């Protein structure tokens, strides 16, 4: 389908990147990679480092569609999607609702649990929480997470009751909503989704405590396995679970679902990223390559979701 679309059909594309979230550095790298790909393929594309003047820039830019490469708050939480909806400017990825729900790990877990989809036991933390009760309920070790932050920022594994309060104080720097989750000691997998197709799974291994910001973007010690080492049936089951979880939260277009197994190799859903990284360390390009999809083709497939949104808006 992509090969039959004339370059002019894409119109004038704006790549939105940067922004003000804690993931700004990664977003700039992702956006630059996407912008270079579009230009390389002869598409008229322009990059915008999103700030308070973005509304004016978008209004005056005469753009025909937007490629969202913003990570974290402002980019994956429905905010920029709402702006683009208001401007009637088609954009890539999930809509307002799907973006807002998937950005919030707590609400994601509650919805999954309501649909009988597996996610690890958890408990909301506040400054008045009794650490001993949390430890008794979830067991130790556990992991503390900000509800609405990406790239594992603010997350900490907790081995003792005493460490729980300090982990909470660290997490609350990133978000007022914080929760503790049962630690899953098994293998970690990620499922990239492209146009409702789940790409080959990637198994992640890191010598660090978990797959944190350093392991994701800077460390050379992180190992990626694709094929992931599961049997064909096991991989298909995980892919089906990932797609069901993705669609259950209203996500669409493209994204990434992260899963981790317990000590018995039972899989649990961790979170969904609706604007995954597109850097040289990123997982979606890696999975796409394993599926025989080169980076430039993948960028066009993602951009194609904006064409579908345009058709929907036009009622054609």
UniProtKB/Swiss-Prot annotation:
Ranges for domain ATP-grasp: 109-304
Catalysed reaction, written as an equation: 2 D-alanine + ATP = D-alanyl-D-alanine + ADP + phosphate + H(+)
Cofactor: Mg(2+); Mn(2+)
Binding site for Mg(2+) 1: 258, 271
Enzyme class: ligase
GO cellular component: cytosol
Enzyme nomenclature, EC number: 6.3.2.4
A molecular-function term among this protein's GO annotations: ATP binding
Cofactor binding notes: Binds 2 magnesium or manganese ions per subunit.
Binding site for ATP: 135-190
Top-level division of the source organism's lineage: Bacteria
Location in or out of the cell: Cytoplasm
InterPro entries: ATP-grasp (IPR011761), ATP_grasp_subdomain_1 (IPR013815), D-Ala_lig_Van_CS (IPR000291), D_ala_D_ala (IPR005905), Dala_Dala_lig_C (IPR011095), Dala_Dala_lig_N (IPR011127), PreATP-grasp_dom_sf (IPR016185)
Single GO biological process annotation from the record: peptidoglycan biosynthetic process
Pathway this chain belongs to: Cell wall biogenesis; peptidoglycan biosynthesis
Main location (coarse class): cytoplasm
Keywords noted in UniProt: ATP-binding, Cell shape, Cell wall biogenesis/degradation, Cytoplasm, Ligase, Magnesium, Manganese, Metal-binding, Nucleotide-binding, Peptidoglycan synthesis
Residues binding Mg(2+) 2, per UniProt: 271, 273
PROSITE patterns: ATP_GRASP (PS50975), DALA_DALA_LIGASE_1 (PS00843), DALA_DALA_LIGASE_2 (PS00844)
Protein task: Cell wall formation.
Family: Belongs to the D-alanine--D-alanine ligase family.
Protein name: D-alanine--D-alanine ligase
Provenance organism: Nitrosococcus oceani (strain ATCC 19707 / BCRC 17464 / JCM 30415 / NCIMB 11848 / C-107)
